[in-house]
């Protein structure tokens, strides 16, 4: 379990924590846990999420287990820098959907004495590093990688497999659209998809 750092008020610098993993791995759950601990300690906390994330609620950050905490939806990372002034702790959910400026924003906040907690997908559905997450993980003092359970093998899962043929990079969804898979299960699923597409192309060419 992650234990919060002890604040050195003489140093007057904060830090960055990143919580990453696949879908259904408990990223938002862990983010909410840390933020509520800070609220219980009477620290001033602000939470932000990208305004495109309206799956459960337009304003609340909600985990798959329905735990929730109030947030401020923002269209761009630059808004966070303005709205977070005077905070002790800043939480950011679904960080992979923000523009690249989120990295500079998080570092600016940490340099001004704020504890910054970021949660997001580390890989997209194609298995590639997702958006600004690699840079956030590189600059963070603490990185926590959480895992789901593979729906096909029961092993640890760290891939988010998309069940449909939609090729858009950003597609919000739940269990109907995605499932967490282990490396072996993901490799096999992607290979089967390629075989199906190849068969479809051959069928069309043969007509």
Task: Describe the function of each predicted region.
Residues 91, 114-122:
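Structural recognition of the conserved hydrophobic beta-strand(s) that form the central parallel beta-sheet
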Residues 94-109, 123-130:
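Conserved ATPase-coupling elements of RecA-like P-loop NTPase cores
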Residues 88, 140-141:
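Conserved acidic residues
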Residues 84-98:
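Conserved P-loop NTPase "ATPase switch" module shared by AAA+ and STAND
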Residues 44, 115, 142:
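Residues at the starts of beta-strands that form the adenosine-phosphate
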Residues 141, 147-165:
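Conserved AAA+ ATPase core "coupling" helix
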Residues 2-85, 124-135, 145-148, 166, ...:
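Conserved P-loop
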Residues 34, 104-112, 132-139:
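Catalytic-core regions built around general acid/base machinery
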